[in-house]
């Protein structure tokens, strides 16, 4: 069944001229994410009228689904913008405010109600790479000395202002995290039962200053709807929800993907040309000098090209295959290094495995190169069969050696970066590819010079 696009329906309703009450009722059937998608197709005046129809609670939900809330918040007077932000979950509010200039952000934060301002300021105090910056303060909290009846009463009292009610978090008399209760267990419990029996004391948690990259896999492994976030004193300061986890995983993947290209994860469509150039140029300068080194090595084999010009036809193939293999090994290694419990023996096993994979792939490609390139050189370059297969054999052996070494380089470099506490994703694709180009050039032209020219006197 084809996925339905509701945007056109929503726009048609908005432009239909229905009375406000009827329009609000019909729009309430649509998810806030679909309503958010429709905002860009409206004029500023139409958006203002829509906000008035929907009410601040719904508008706050819609804003939480926007990828970039800045242009929409700036359309609102600061007082109205603050009202919308105060009705958003704290983590969504911080995401929306992060898109604003510091002056606009401070103006809105200054007009938030006391509780919202405290939550937002707390989340803004964390670094972008810390769990605390992505948590929400929207959760149910009860004390461990309550009865079942009191806990149910507290749940009903807090549920009106909190969406995350599937798990109740329990604190002791000192406000320290004590455990968690599943909502289902509380609902089916008898009034005379002890609340203590329902509390999961060994409930998993994360700490507010933990790096997102260090604990994201652990959060995913628990597969809970939410996890508590504790400070250094063991106090409950927020929770990480499953929706937050999806965003964090997506951000981490985007971050690693950018680093594999030698970029930064912050670059986007709204960033200026100068800022993008400033972020990319250092990598490109470093790679320029490495490229010059590769070129100088190629220049050292001018005599080989002069005697046997055909070898230059297959240079790019050997270099590309070496680079591809190195990048594959890099991607596998970065994924494995996420496991903080990875032992030295497992790292050596990975290194040995990647080299064997490179060897097997290289051998298979070498056989193909021997046959196909041999025929190509004979029929299209007019070499006799013997010389044609000697040349294709040299290419094949070069592929084997270059691919094994490239597998080694693509595995060992991120391991070294990880050892010295540098993000292994920084050992990016361009760097690995350039190093492997250097290795492949030396192997290919070295074999051609030693075997084909010095030993067999071809050319």
Language-model-derived ranges and their functions:
Residues 1-260:
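Hydrophobic packing positions in regular secondary-structure scaffolds
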Residues 6, 12, 17-18, 24-25, ...:
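Short leucine-rich amphipathic alpha-helices used at interfaces
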Residues 32, 145, 149, 209, ...:
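Electropositive phosphate-/nucleotide-binding environments in soluble metabolic enzymes
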Residues 238, 433-444:
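Alpha-helical transmembrane segments that form the membrane-embedded catalytic/substrate-binding core
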Residues 255-408, 412-424, 434-435, 447-459:
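Alpha-helical transmembrane segments and their membrane-interface boundaries
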